[in-house]
Amino acid sequence: ITNRLVGSEMCIRDSIDNKKIGITGWSLGGTSSLYAAWLPLAEKLAPNGERFASHLSYYPLAMYWPEDMRWSKAPMLNLLGGKDDYTPFSLTQKLTKGISDSGGNCKDILYEEGLHGFDAVQPKTYWPDSIAPNTEKFARIDLKGDISFETDDGEILAGNTVEDRIKLFEKVAKLGTWTGGNWEIRRRAKKDAFDFISKILD
């Protein structure tokens, strides 16, 4: 995210309209694209005020719910798969509502039959060693930036260090997920993405 925001600043010198630079990402990149709109993070990474004009995120992992719910007012669109067992679409939908309720401009499009990677050309594939969240609950980010997660039995787990996250994975993660493209969804998602981006460029 830092590199992209710094790139936006450099574009000023290159006579490029930096007010029309958006960010797009897939999976983990989609997570980065989504949370790049979280203003406390953007303010830290780009203190001179560079911001993205749009945020297009394919099947992001919306695992974090910040206590400070200040978000960019730039348009945000999340493209989600209804059969994604890798990055749960339900978490993204809940966060989208939270962002919108907090004054942001976030929307989702759900492709009911879509797996993770629904726009890929690769066929449906099972990955037995992939790690995915097995929860409908968010990790929380407090005002200091510390991450925590409350389990169903009330245990509070930290999520700040590698060791913390390994312990967290042991509690709330599962092994084994499906990925795979769907040509019909691929075509629809491409059109939805182009329609979204074209509105920013007009």
Regions found by a protein language model. Give the residues of each.
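The feature captures the conserved acid-bearing segment of alpha/beta-hydrolase catalytic domains
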Residues: 47-113
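C-terminal catalytic histidine-bearing segment of alpha/beta-hydrolase fold enzymes
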Residues: 105-202
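Single conserved hydrophobic/aromatic residue that forms the stacking wall/gate
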Residues: 1-7, 11-12
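Alpha/beta-hydrolase fold nucleophile elbow
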Residues: 15-27
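Alpha-helix termini
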Residues: 13-14, 41-48, 102
